[in-house]
Amino acid sequence: MVGLHFDRGPVKHVDIGWRVPNLLRELLDGIGKEYSLQKCIPITVLEKVLWKYQSIDNVAALSGKEYSRVQLCGPKCAFRILCNIPSDQLVIPDIEKYNEFNVNKTLYEGFLLALDTIQHTFNSQLFNDSPPHELNSKAESSVSHTAEDYFDSYISNFSRISETNLEKLHSRRELKNIECDAKKSLKILNAYDKLYDDQLDELEKKLEDIQYKQHALRQKKGTILSTSEKLNNMIYISKQSRKNIEEVSLLLKYDMNKKSSSVYSGWETTNLLSKSELAFGFNENNNNYNDDSLGEEDANDESENYDTFNLEGKNSRYSGSSVDYISEDTRQQKAKNKHEIGTVLSALKNAHENNITCLDFDEPFGTLYSAGQLDNTIKVWDLSSSKFIGSFNAHLSTINCMQLDTQQQIIISGGRDSLVRLWDIKKFQDYSTNYNDIENYYEETNCIFECDSHSDEISSISYDNFNLLTGSQDKTIKHWDLITGKCVQTFDVSFYLNNSPPFENKFSPTKKNYFAHSEAPTIGSLQCFESALASGTKDGLIRLWDLRSGKVIRILEGHTDAITSLKFDMTNLITGSLDKNIRIWDMRNWSLVNSYGYQSPVWSLDFNSANVVSATGGKTSEIFRRKENNHCIPNENYSFIKSEVQFVKYKEDWLIEGRSNGDIEILTI
């Protein structure tokens, strides 16, 4: 290698590329050992050049995009140094291509850019002609600024720079500083530009996701609407089919009554409609049937083809598949073709030896459960055929009250033996035409639950959603949880009744006491719904309880004697009493809506939205039309009947009466 020597002339500015610092380090470490470069070039000059390129203030050492002018050697010396650098290391890469492959800024670079921006904004706000006492407040307020605030302040600072002012400057140093600051700011702006591009991409993706979710929700909403329409159609078809089934059952019922003798002694079979009469109409002018009506033999042939069907979860042994009927008429309108409201469809003669104390049934044309005084059994009847199915020993003494739950397929009974029992009636609900061994099927082990905490006879019960309320002559009301089988709370009403007058049997015209006990019931009636309980006691007061707190929240006054029955719906509460009055209360404002009296005490009542039916010890049930606000007299002639109506049960336009002689009658209203 030929030795190099320095020119002794004046030192000039030499442009050295951005890779010179590394090359000089290699020259000092490697090349100088093998060649005589160190001998030709003073070591102090090389150290100064290397130190210059390693300086923090050197922009070329940091970025490599600018050239540095140094005053360390002449141009010939610099040329000789560059000539000894390998040619492959002299290639300067394309900065634009380099940036294409390194588009994303590192976290450190972004932090430096943000730090420069914050520092620049902080200084501009802190020292912008502010007095000393305001510096601390401005410094504290600047800390809470967001990156967007710094960016806006950063842009506003450069917007105030005028190009005309730059043209007036003649200082190279100031122009150089402004140029460097502008290039740094340009880097920061490029970083912000990339940042905002990324944020815009994220927002576009979020908008796409939102649009996709919106489309999916609209599809689900459309599915819900279409499914709702299908369900509404199913409900409509189910109601129509149910009406058709009930109409066919009614036709079969009338046909059986036509072929048999009168079910009630002294009544003529002409009082009952036949299937032909309903299907083809009746001529009132000549009291004859139409010529094209079905004959009795045809009816027998068709009745053999009926299969089992299920009506609202209740089993019946009749179904209509080929019987002609008038589909636009309801079963009430069919009965009105010849009979008025109150027509007796059938009767169960001598169902019990003594008066009926309580009954309940599965409507329509389902199963009837009844109990009588001095009879410890519950008897089961088929309403479609008026046949006796069976009975079971439910208590040790008279049964005072019962309630049927067809969904759970249980019946709850309370008796004078101070016991409340729950019975499984699934066997009776699914009975076949063979009635053998059904009566023997029920034994003591078929009682699925027994409440034995009362010390006196049971006078009333109420069941709703696994909550059972029992009222007793021991002046207590007990709340039972049937899931756990435990008594959860007891309401003592004895302190309410201390001043009540003793019951005197002076209300019945026949001087008979229809109660199973010798005096008016202490707790005459109960009804619960969820956490609400209504109770009627012999002091003539109706108390409304909150089962959650166990306290009386309201008392309704108006009756002057013992409450015997009560029932409420979502709007009204109707009560009956031994004071011969029935009162209708509005549960929305607890005001008395209507009140009407009878000549005898009210022993039992039931109602729906159209009628209020009550038993007042007369030969017929009392029917009060709620909309017309008048009483309805049944069409049947009861002048020859000596028994009195003691208990009524009214469901879906079907009324069942329990009489004092043990008979049970089924009527349509």
Swiss-Prot record:
Pfam families: WD40 (PF00400)
Biological processes per GO annotation: mitochondrial fission; peroxisome fission
PROSITE patterns documented for this protein: WD_REPEATS_1, WD_REPEATS_2, WD_REPEATS_REGION
SUPFAM superfamilies: WD40 repeat-like (SSF50978)
Record keywords, A-Z: Coiled coil, Membrane, Mitochondrion, Mitochondrion outer membrane, Repeat, WD repeat
Residue ranges the record marks as coiled coil: 189-222
WD repeat placement: 351-391, 394-433, 453-492, 516-557, 558-595, 597-634, 640-669
Membrane topology, record value: Peripheral membrane protein
Keyword Transmembrane: no
One GO location term (cellular component): mitochondrial outer membrane
InterPro entries: G-protein_beta_WD-40_rep (IPR020472), WD40/YVTN_repeat-like_dom_sf (IPR015943), WD40_repeat_CS (IPR019775), WD40_repeat_dom_sf (IPR036322), WD40_rpt (IPR001680)
Compartment annotation: Mitochondrion outer membrane
Function per UniProt: Involved in mitochondrial fission. Has a partially redundant function to MDV1 in acting as an adapter protein required to form mitochondrial fission complexes. Formation of these complexes is required to promote constriction and fission of the mitochondrial compartment at a late step in mitochondrial division.
Name recorded for this polypeptide: CCR4-associated factor 4 homolog
